C-alpha cells in the first residue's frame, strides 16, 4: 500500500527553499518512504520520536537523508492512510525538533 502524502503549508515552503537538485532527492526519498512510513519496528522506514530536546514529539517520525544533510519530521494519519509532513530542513536535530514542536502546536497535530 502506498500512503498518501500531505505537506503542511510551512513544509511546502521548506521544500521551496531547498536547492532544486536537493528537492529532487528529497522527493524521491518521500516517495520511497510513502511505501511504508511506519516505524522501523514495524518494518517501515520511520524512526519514532518521543521527548526530544525538551519537546514532546510523541507519535511523530523522522527520516534523515544523510547524503544531503536533510531531516524530515512527519506524522502518520492511520485512519486516512496519509503521512503528513511537518518539517523538511537542513538544520540540526535540535532546531528541527523545536520547529516540529512549534508547528505541531500551531496546527493541533
Question: Could you tell me what each predicted segment is?
Answer:
Residues 18, 33-37, 107:
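Solvent-exposed amphipathic alpha-helical surface segments
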Residues 34-64:
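A short, surface-exposed loop/turn module that caps and links secondary-structure elements
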Residues 13, 58, 65-109:
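Enriched for short, Lys/Arg-rich terminal
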Amino acid at each position: 500500500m502506498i500512503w498518501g502524502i500531505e505537506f503542511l503549508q510551512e513544509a511546502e515552503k521548506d521544500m521551496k527553499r531547498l536547492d532544486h537538485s536537493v528537492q529532487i532527492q528529497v522527493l524521491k526519498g518521500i516517495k520511497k518512504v510513502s511505501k511504508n512510513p511506519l516505524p522501523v519496528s514495524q518494518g517501515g522506514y520511520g524512526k519514532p520520536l518521543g521527548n526530544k530536546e525538551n519537546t514532546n514529539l510523541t507519535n511523530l517520525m523522522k527520516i534523515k537523508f544523510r547524503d544531503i544533510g536533510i531531516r524530515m519530521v512527519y506524522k502518520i494519519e492511520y485512519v486516512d492512510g496519509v503521512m503528513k509532513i511537518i518539517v523538511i530542513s537542513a538544520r540540526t536535530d535540535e532546531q528541527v525538533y523545536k520547529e516540529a514542536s512549534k508547528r505541531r502546536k500551531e496546527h493541533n497535530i
